[in-house]
Amino acid sequence: MSNRTIASYGTTQQLRSFERRFGYTSHVSPRPQIREGQDKRDVGRYSIPEAAGYLAVPARTMRRWFLGERRLFNPSYRRGGDVLLSFNDVTEAYIIEVLRNHYDFSPIKLRRIVEALRVRSNLDKPLAQREFYAIPEFQSFVDRRVIRGQQTNIDLAHHGNLVFDQFVAALGKRVQRDRRGHACRLYPWKESDSDESPLSMDPDVLSGELVVSGTRIPATMLYAKKLAGKTAAQIARSYHLKPALIRKVLNHFEREKP
């Protein structure tokens, strides 16, 4: 969404508030072109502050994960001072955020798991390119694969031991995957331990912008209207949505998690 569109909703002060929330500036990073045969999920599309706003993760945390001295991930696009994250980058960050905030994985354990997965899978972005599940009871991370024709789970946090499917709590309610196990849609939601999915991101819907699930309505547009003084009921009437859904969408942006 352009700053000009946002500006039409409110005052200059409200525009600046919106820009701060999503890191929008007058400088526009050049968007990389999709190369022949390249998966669109690997193409840089989001600035770090923008991705942080979409995931309700503090921007400083996202910068540390992608640009810090001991970073967890490498951004898909980096040219000089321009850094853009791909859909796969955002997927990996969201999985780490869910494990960190809702399953209490320590930073040391998360780093050990990410590094082990890269080595064992031989993939650049294994969290996005393989199907994984969280196991809250054992504070473990599990790589789901087929062994001797039977689908099993390998507990990477406990030295490769096998664990049973009945103990596996699916992270899959937040990360939808295609038949190859690649992430194809995210349902980022601040209350990720809830079964609700009011928001989604899909590379085939508005180029991966955060939208109200089941629609092509950008969530940032609703937030801009809220900053301009519109109530949830007024916004709901404009888009023929329920006020309760609008309130959930707006709450996603209201406060950052620690």
List PLM regions with ranges.
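Short, Lys/Arg-enriched anionic-surface-contact patches
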Residues: F18-G37, E196-I217
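Polyanion-binding surface elements
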Residues: G37-M62
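Short alpha-helical segment immediately N-terminal to, or the first helix within
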Residues: K40-R41, L99, A224-K225
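Residues within the helices of the helix-turn-helix
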Residues: P49, E115, A233
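DNA-contacting interfaces and partner/effector-binding or oligomerization modules
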Residues: G68-R71, S76-D155
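Hydrophobic packing positions characteristic
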Residues: D143-D204, G208
